[in-house]
Amino acid sequence: MYVCFPEPPCTEKGCYLRLVDFRGGMEVQRQKTLEAIKNHNCGFYYEQSADNFSKIPGSPVAYWVEIQMYRAFETEKIGKYAISDGQTKTGNNDKYLRMLWEVPAFEIGRGKRWVLHAKGGAFRRWYGNIDTLIDWSDSAREHYRSDHVARIAPEYIWFRRGICWTLISSNKLHGFRLLQENSTFNLAAPSIFFDDDRMMLYILGYLNSKFSQEIIALLNPTLNTNISDITSQPLNYGKSPECEDAIIELVETNISLSKSDWDSFETSWDFQIHPLLRYAALTPQRIAQEEKNGYLPMNGIADAYRHWEQACDDRFYQLKANEEELNRIFIDIYGLQDELTPEVEEKDVTVRKADLTRDVKSLISYAVGCMFGRYSLDHQGLVYAGGDWEQTYHRNVLVDEGGNAISFGGIRIAVGKNYQINVDGQWQDCTYPPEADNIIPICDDEYFEDDIVGRFVTFIETVYGKNTLEENLKFIADALGGKSQPRDVIRSYFLNDFFNDHCKIYQKRPIYWQFDSGKKNGFKALIYLHRYQPDTIARIRTDYVHEQQSRYRTAIADLEQRIAGASTAERVKLTKQLKKLQDQAEELHVYEEKIHHLADQMIAIDLDDGVKVNYAKFQDVLAKIK
């Protein structure tokens, strides 16, 4: 930037050249300077009175800003009404913060040990980015007060609705979101509050507008957005109730749209049901609509995905239109029609469109959740995440003539494998029962009847029906990018990719733990963290590892016999299979010794310690978290 100032008091305009966008050294900038001297309409020549700079807090030399922008600062500032009074800092995040899926669900909420905690996150507007918990026990809060590094926000701003954002943005734009009630926040998620809820919603709409983004760039052209950058902004409120009503209505709709998107994924605290199940139900109205649109109504995943895709598009473009309408309103309020346009680029709309591979993988994850009882086809939302398993699920049991459960040694006698689930205080048979022993093997062949592929196929058949099973499995396999038979593709996904995807989605804090013998795939099995018991590893060893070893011995003996009588060509093929089985058997032999050592210890875990601490206790027999 080159500047030519008149003498103080600077009531006349100075001349400014904006050369920062021109690359190529001083010679290029010299040429551009000469060009600007000859042609003031070149696009990078500006005239501005230095008196205007002082109208903006911090007096930035914003010579390119139009006079209407300066006049906007002649109104009240947001800081006149905003409440901001410190943030909470733990001093030891590893000890006091958890992802919301790590700890028992019954310990989460106001008045309990763990509460929701905003700590920034990716660029997102209106709602979301809260997936963290903070320890809010008496002892933890005392630590925050007394520790020389930690601090705690004053009590009067605990659990209030407000506006939060991410302190450090990797995006030129800044996303402002509703901080929901019953949440806390830390310094990575600065937050402000208001006594007037309507004003808060109005300001949330304003902050997500193009005009506000321009102001932020003036006040602080860095990646940080501090509270002072927000409280210093102009506030034009209370002058046009009709206009304010329109803004607030749009903001409330945008919050609802963003919440609907956020809650469609299972890492949300308010997740209810997977979209490909939600959109699979064929009501009479939907059947009529399908036929009207020329589709043959079928209860298949392809149809569910098509409806989900349309719902995502509707939400996406409705939010885009609403944001553009908010931009129009604020551009008109501040008279910047010649400077700003209301259009919003699609890349800046922060709700998600449908994604076939992502959504099919998340369906698989949801199915695994149903296998372990975390979710259920009979009850929406989180069903079991710690606590008394028998209060949520129980096996059908023998009863006497009076209807009382018959027990032996204090243990009720179960009948078959059927489970019942407690739905709002009423016991009913499970449509898709959870795995009884919390152990699901992942095999490269059909060694176990209840291996994960078999259970997944049953899940798909249960949800979508037997008549469409094969085409549904093919749809899933195609979405996973497989080229072989659908069941083989699905098996390969569970064997090679499921756990890694799970770790990514759950931010390296997995709730489904993969017991893994090594690269030869000699043995793999999943358990659900919240159902872990001290004897779980012993049961893995005796009921699954030993069984797998027995099957390897049988398969190896069979192959050796077949090789002895095989032709040359067939012998080569069988020998290759034999080598693979022998390698797997050897790998499993070594693994059995490791798991034997742990099984004998009957190790207990405390879910409040978090995944990182608990996983480390078994790291020698678990898959590496990547």
Question: What are these language model-derived features?
Answer:
Residues 268-269, 275, 281-293, 313, ...:
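Terminal accessory regions of large proteins
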Residues 6, 167, 237-239:
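Short, low-complexity Ser/Thr-rich regulatory SLiMs
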Residues 89, 115, 119, 128, ...:
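Short, functionally important structural connectors and interaction interfaces within domains
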Residues 116, 121, 166, 192, ...:
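Extended Lys/Arg-rich polyanion-binding regions
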Residues 113, 146-151, 158-160, 182-197, ...:
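Glycine- and acidic
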